[in-house]
Design a protein with these regions (language model features):
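Domain-level signal for soluble alpha/beta catalytic cores
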Residues: 1-513, 519-851
Length: 851
């Protein structure tokens, strides 16, 4: 166990703390290996090594329902109230051949328990039940907290970590053999849980996420991003649970298998749920069909299996027979450097040459406006710089907020948090302060790059432990105590030393970008050749990737874009992988797109053709003075999802989530626009466009919410400036999470989006009694109700609420949503509409209210 370099105050704000010497020397901050784990026996060790199979148990909720659990009861309290029921179910799984029994602690965090019991008591009772059932291994079960993390919600990463750490300590004290983190949809929350397990115990950590029908989690994370990130931060086994049936999950698991060497696990549902004649939730895949589908995944390389919703001991017995007749085959992924956000992977394969443009514009050096924005705390401007670079073609964003007069630790946290909510691009965390670096990478949802380490021993001692502990990539600068060498050989020697030192921490060359440091040609003309030769040496002998800040070459010289673009082309020829540059430079981006064709990275030249169709030769333009003047700006055209909105500033600001700029623009337009015209012809079409982009998979929930927040700022401006009553009320909607269910993330997102569409939304909260919903509908004359449920055991309460509303208020329309629902199930329980996501809820509301 250890304490991170960053501590935090009760509100979750990061505070700098001294760097502990032992950690700086790698005593605690290092890449965790299997030899660091406390593993109960060789059978469990073989499963973690990927050389043996492991069988987890199956579903608990439907088994409890079959055993007579009352609708709305908190399953974790049954460990005290009816322990024999829990033990009997778990004993059935033991008798079916399950190796791992999952303790009944899925919702045993302090947020969900809400004072009903202590976390420690729940874990102690749950583990006792599992031991009484004869479990070989008991897994401490850690599920989602039930609240959105920032920037989408109000829960900080540190608060989430503390909740998980309390569970981990309770699990260790209760005697679990391992931890299973499951049913996660938020990559940041999953990372907090994995870190809590690693930093508060030495037990194995299994981690799984849940994916929608589109192959992404609720917040837009793909199987590849999940696997790369969970592998990087130290999960010992990773994979998928819940989601769908085994046949549907096979392809998702296969995608994970291509990007990780860690064992992959799958716990699928038994198909789709429906309600039987007795009102019970049942699933449609029986044990033989389930085992047949899982067999395909095992052949693909999945080595740890089990079941989730709807699976029973019979299903697990069929899997036992399956794995007893199979031995996992060794797997070896192709080495590559992977950098991810929560939604996007940038992959630089070691056996090829692929280009990733790192946008350099979020760096206050030489940028007066950015400096002032950082001093003023105007992070909206920082975010706008990130959005612009994404639109201009950057693949990764460098983030540097270093100014001596600001609290860099606090600001870099805030900047990275907001950038992750507004752009899809991975980030490169750029700071000379180890505390600032850790503040950002610890809370980052994905696998980032740290910029940078160099050949100075003190810097390597401070930064490489962070790279190891958080599983990041790192930029290595070829300078040391003697400065920047003049020769290629001396630069290479420093790079070689950095790679060797990194290896001591378990950091391979596939995670290292060497930057041979560009010197300006105006004062170091002969250095250009040395820089390129040094880079070639690094590529040939060290197996690393190479980065360069290419803009520096032309400093102090005229026609900087011309000289810089020629140097960039030469650098690509020498093996440059990641130019750190301004993607807003047309000449630079012309060089990038052209090289991608010549290197065959741009297959079929499709990207090049899309960008340059209708291109006009600039040398011919030069013959026309007026055209030459228009073409002289070196501005790169943007190619983005928001291009259709570029002729309307409000639409563009909403679609791109630029909330920092929209209030002033709204106020300006109100001078000669009617308020309702502005809403109906600018804001609402923009939100509709965002919904289309969301449906197309070009936007994900964080971007949807950023756009909704930008629209809210605009609406608030209109309301503030317009007389009361001038803005029409679009309609009243009531939303609630049903009786017995305490999960309200999806409901809260729906409320926010509907608010921003101009509806009056009454939020009744979670665990809402049907009578309370009815009372609100009658008293407020509500026409549309939204009901949410996450747990199979609470769908009965949802059906009860629907029947009551339809009986007492026949004209009311009801939307339902939640992880356990689908269109058929929604129809079966009497709902008028099923919404798969918040964007669909907004479209249904417009239909109901005739908009």
């Amino acid at each position: 166990m250890f304490t991170p370099l960053i501590t935090h105050d009760p509100d979750g704000a990061a505070l700098a703390a001294p760097v502990d010497a032992a950690r700086r020397n790698g005593a605690a901050y290092k890449t965790r290996t299997i030899d660091d784990l406390r593993i109960r026996d060789n059978r469990l060790r073989a499963a973690i090594e990927g050389t043996g199979h492991l069988l987890f148990d199956g579903g608990m909720g439907t088994m409890l329902q079959a055993a007579g659990m009352k609708a709305g009861a908190l399953p974790e309290l049954l460990n005290f109230e009816e322990p024999q029921v829990i033990t009997d179910i778990q004993r059935q799984y033991v008798e079916a051949g399950c190796d791992v029994i999952t303790a009944n602690t899925f919702g045993a965090n302090a947020h969900k328990l809400d004072g009903a019991a202590t976390v420690a008591d729940v874990f102690a009772a749950a583990v006792a039940c599992a031991r009484a059932a004869g479990a070989r291994y008991v897994a401490g079960d850690i599920g989602p907290i039930g609240a959105l993390l920032r920037p989408l919600g109000t829960l900080s990463f540190d608060e989430a970590y503390d909740l998980f750490a309390e569970e981990v300590r309770a699990g260790v004290d209760a005697g679990v053999d391992l931890f299973i983190i499951e049913t996660m949809t938020d990559l940041a929350e999953t990372k907090a849980a994995v870190l809590a397990c690693r930093e508060n115990s030495d037990l194995p950590v299994f981690a799984t996420m849940t994916f929608e029908e589109d192959g992404r989690t609720f917040l837009g994370t793909s199987p590849e991003v999940a696997a790369i990130t969970l592998d990087a931060i130290g999960a010992d086994v990773l994979g998928i649970n819940c989601s769908q049936g085994p046949a549907e999950l096979r392809g998702l698991a296969a995608r994970m298998l291509t990007v990780t060497d860690k064992p992959v696990m799958v716990q699928a549902n038994a198909g789709l749920p429906h309600v039987d004649d007795d009102g019970n939730t049942v699933f449609d895949i029986q044990a033989p069909e389930y085992a047949e589908a899982v067999a395909g995944m095992i052949e693909d390389g999945v080595s740890v299996v089990g079941g989730c919703c709807g699976t029973t001991p019979t299903h697990m017995a069929a899997l036992r027979t399956l794995i007893d007749n199979h031995t996992p085959s060794p797997r070896h992924r192709k080495p590559s450097m992977s950098v991810t956000s929560a939604q996007t992977v940038v992959d630089l394969p070691c056996d090829g040459h692929k280009i990733a443009v790192i946008g350099e514009r979020i760096n206050p050096t030489g940028k007066k406006r950015l400096k002032q924005a950082l001093r003023d705390g105007d992070l909206g401007y920082v975010v706008s710089q990130g959005i612009s670079q994404q639109e201009q073609g950057a693949d990764i964003l460098d983030v540097n907020v270093g100014l001596p007069e600001i609290d860099e630790v606090k600001v870099i946290q805030q900047a990275t948090e907001q950038l992750q909510g507004s752009t899809l691009l991975p980030l490169q965390i750029d700071s000379t302060d180890p505390a600032a670096v850790e503040a950002a990478v610890r809370r980052y949802a994905g696998k980032p790059i740290i910029n940078s380490v160099n050949g100075k021993q003190q810097i390597m001692d401070e930064i490489l432990p962070l790279v190891a502990h958080y599983g990041t990539n790192v930029v290595g600068l070829t300078l040391d105590e003697g400065g920047i060498p003049d020769t290629a050989e001396a630069r290479f020697a420093i790079a070689e030393r950095i790679v060797a030192e990194a290896a001591r921490y378990g950091i391979g060359p596939d995670r290292i970008l060497i930057d041979c440091l560009v010197m300006t040609a105006s004062t170091n003309q002969r250095q250009a050749e040395q820089i390129l030769r040094a880079m070639s040496l690094c590529k040939e002998h060290l197996g690393v990737k190479c980065a360069l800040g290419v803009s520096n070459i032309s400093f102090g010289l005229p026609a900087r874009p011309l000289l810089g673009s020629v140097f960039l082309a030469a650098a690509f020829g020498a093996g440059l992988d990641a130019p750190i540059m301004n993607p807003g430079s047309k000449r630079f981006m012309d060089t990038v797109y052209s090289y991608r064709v010549l290197s065959a990275e741009d297959e079929g030249s499709t990207g090049y053709i899309e960008r340059y169709a209708g291109w006009t030769d600039p040398y011919k333009i030069a013959a026309n003075p007026a055209a030459a003047q228009a073409a002289s700006t070196d501005a790169v055209p943007t190619v983005s999802a928001t291009a259709s909105a570029d002729d309307d500033p409000i639409r563009h600001m909403v679609v791109s989530g630029r909330k920092g700029e929209i209030a002033a623009e709204t106020e300006r337009l109100l001078a000669d626009h009617d308020a309702m015209d502005l809403i109906n012809n600018h804001f609402i079409p923009a939100l509709d466009e965002v919904g289309v982009l969301f449906d197309q998979g070009k936007f994900f929930l964080p971007q949807l919410m950023a756009s909704a927040e930008a629209a809210r700022v605009g609406f608030d401006t209109i309301k503030r400036l317009m007389p009361a009553g001038e803005i029409a009320d679009k309609g009243k909607i009531c939303v609630a999470t049903v009786k017995g269910d305490i999960h309200d993330i999806g409901k809260n997102i729906v409320k926010m989006l509907l608010d921003n569409y101009g509806y009056t939304v009454f939020d009744l909260g979670r665990d809402v009694d049907p009578q309370e919903v009815l009372k609100t509908v009658q008293e407020r004359d509500i026409k549309l109700v939204g009901l949410s449920a996450l747990m199979t055991t609470t769908v009965v309460a949802m059906e009860e609420t629907i029947k009551l509303l339809h009986a007492e208020v026949p004209g009311v329309k009801i939307i339902v949503g939640g992880a356990v629902l689908n269109p058929e199930y929604a129809k079966q329980i009497g709902a008028d509409y099923y919404a798969k996501d918040a964007a669909e809820s907004a479209r249904i509301a417009e239909e109901v209210f005739g908009q």
